[in-house]
């Protein structure tokens, strides 16, 4: 059985799927969670507090998933392209599922609630894993390839490929191409 806090976060997330944050009312979130409005305010203090907790939960879950798919791809012997493709696939699935993740990746920083820089966190995580797993690659080259692959991945969030597999294949090809190009 979920705690009141989890039920409230779930209700707020569900409401966000139907309308913008500015249109969501605290009384509706409390009712959907099956708790009183006072319980909501005791837990989060304000609508901004609820938003911050929801963003934190979604962001942390997304980034934990990125770490898991990167580790699995590396453990399975994937090359740098396959590792980033795994992160791209996770990103595409989560961007479809969560308006918060989608907004944070596509530049929704002017939105209410304010969103974190998930693209930067994704770029850093993938770059760190690839530099560690593939020590023969130059860190600057890896960082540049990850920047380009991230931009391609975000473009697929905005304008989807026919399938996620197609998008991930293109991301993997891009990373491989950039990392095999002779350095100057």
Residue ranges and their predicted role:
Residues 1-32, 49-52, 74:
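Basic, helix-initiating cap at the start of DNA-binding domains
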Residues 60-63, 103, 110-136, 140-147:
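Amphipathic alpha-helical packing segments from all-alpha helical-bundle domains
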């Amino acid at each position: 059985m979920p705690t009141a806090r989890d039920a409230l976060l779930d209700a707020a997330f569900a409401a966000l799927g139907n309308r913008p944050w500015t249109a969501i009312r605290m009384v509706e979130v409390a009712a959907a969670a099956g708790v009183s409005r006072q319980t909501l305010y005791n837990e989060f203090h304000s609508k901004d507090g609820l938003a911050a907790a929801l963003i934190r939960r979604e962001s942390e879950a997304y980034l934990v998933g990125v770490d898991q798919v990167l580790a699995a791809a590396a453990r399975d012997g994937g090359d740098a392209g396959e590792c980033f493709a795994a992160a791209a696939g996770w990103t595409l699935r989560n961007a479809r599922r969560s308006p918060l993740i989608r907004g944070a990746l596509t530049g929704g920083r002017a939105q209410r609630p304010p969103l974190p820089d998930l693209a930067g966190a994704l770029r850093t995580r993938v770059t760190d894993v690839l530099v560690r797993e593939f020590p023969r690659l130059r860190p600057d080259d890896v960082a540049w390839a990850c920047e380009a692959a991230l931009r391609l991945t975000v473009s697929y969030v905005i304008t989807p490929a026919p399938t996620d597999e197609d998008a991930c294949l293109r991301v993997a090809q891009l990373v491989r191409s950039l990392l095999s190009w002779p350095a100057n």
